[in-house]
Amino acid sequence: MEQSSLLLKKQLADMRRVPVDGFSAGLVDDNDIYKWEVLVIGPPDTLYEGGFFKAILDFPRDYPQKPPKMKFISEIWHPNIDKEGNVCISILHDPGDDKWGYERPEERWLPVHTVETILLSVISMLTDPNFESPANVDAAKMQRENYAEFKKKVAQCVRRSQEE
């Protein structure tokens, strides 16, 4: 059995044994430890409060040397989530130097990260977006220039997530 699958099984068991507020996780298919379905609960005191946003975590076979990819399958309007649902945060970027110079190496993926640290970073991103490098330029622009419209669009996403 691959080291990565053993590590993922341990991380899943740890999360089930000691759940963390704000999210839950499980396997999409019991026979595939590399594909997880997660539910991110909109953090209190944010525009996303009350939302139940589903996402997929796709782990590479060389995890934890390389980060997983995270994609929301629930619609979510946020500057750091592109229109296809892909999450763009530093710790999900491959380790090493950033060729564009936006991120320091220690901000990027490190093998010490776990599923829990990833999901806590996503919750932090929902609370405090990074406007320096938006994945959804339209959402970032709307939040800056027409906050009322931005709030309305996020509220629609929250409502839809409650109906899924």
Swiss-Prot record:
Describe which pathway this protein belongs to, using the record's wording.
Protein modification; protein ubiquitination
Q: What InterPro entries is this protein classified in?
A: Ub_conjugating_enzyme, UBQ-conjugat_E2_core, UBQ-conjugating_AS, UBQ-conjugating_enzyme/RWD
Give this protein's Gene Ontology molecular function annotations: ATP binding; ubiquitin conjugating enzyme activity
User: Boundaries of each UBC core domain copy?
Assistant: 3-163
Q: Name one GO biological process term.
A: proteasome-mediated ubiquitin-dependent protein catabolic process
Q: Enumerate the UniProt keywords alphabetically.
A: ATP-binding, Nucleotide-binding, Transferase, Ubl conjugation pathway
Its Enzyme Commission number?
A: 2.3.2.23
The active site of this protein is located at: 88 (glycyl thioester intermediate)
Domain of life of the organism in this record? Eukaryota
Catalysis performed (reactions): S-ubiquitinyl-[E1 ubiquitin-activating enzyme]-L-cysteine + [E2 ubiquitin-conjugating enzyme]-L-cysteine = [E1 ubiquitin-activating enzyme]-L-cysteine + S-ubiquitinyl-[E2 ubiquitin-conjugating enzyme]-L-cysteine
Instruction: Give the family this protein belongs to, as stated in its UniProt record.
Output: Belongs to the ubiquitin-conjugating enzyme family.
Output this protein's name.
Probable ubiquitin-conjugating enzyme E2 7
Task: Please give the organism.
Answer: Caenorhabditis elegans
**Which lineage ranks, top first, belong to the organism behind this chain?**
Eukaryota, Metazoa, Ecdysozoa, Nematoda, Chromadorea
- What gene, per UniProt, encodes this protein? ubc-7
